Amino acid sequence: MRAVLALVLLLSLAGCFSSPVVHFYVLASPEGEDISARDREAEGPRVAIMPVSLPGYLQRPQMVVRQGDDVDIRIEDFHRWGEDLSLGIARVLSLTMTRDMRSRRGVAMPLRTGAPADYRAQVDIRRFEGAPGGKVQLEAAWSLSRDGKTLRDGVFRTEGEAGASMADMIEAQSDLLEELGTELARTTLAADAGSSQAERGRDGRQSQSGGKKRE
């Protein structure tokens, strides 16, 4: 009898407590005019965003919050990404690059779309976390290549301040990715301008060579 009463008591207590709500988040798309790459025909440089690599501690659906120093992190079981983080990063980068290359009618797309590309951008995330009401940080190694040859590469570091909520932190992280996308767009346009100038130089030399008369 006591065992039955104990079970009833446990069930009653369980009914008094509701399970915590799990919140899901996605990275914010960059602001700007209509930048849907699928709706426009690229006439300028076309960039494929290669699959983004993440450090092991970020390869999880739960969000990661850094606690005060460089070694202490907290895994948030009730705050989760609503999309694969690497895919979300590629999405924000491609949209930002497309927006920032619009003056040259350039476009950037994740490689998985299968769209034709002149350049490939590789991004390896080394650090991408923060804390609500504190700092958010991004560190990423990147490279831009064409025809299998690396044209430019570097390490991008930036940080910002987040508001008090988890959503505020995601907004701040999205802003950091937008900064990286702008840097990649600027690099792509510079590399493409250099390639175009070199091609014009080769065409000019070939034209001059073809125009010489034989004696």
Question: Where are the regions a protein language model picked out?
Answer:
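Soluble periplasmic/extracytoplasmic beta-strand elements of cell-envelope proteins
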Residues: 46-52, 64, 120-124, 137-143, ...
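Surface-exposed short loop/turn segments
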Residues: 17-34, 42, 95, 100-148, ...
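A structural "domain/chain start" motif
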Residues: 16-85, 192-215
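Short secondary-structure boundary motifs at beta->alpha junctions and helix caps
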Residues: 70-82, 149-186
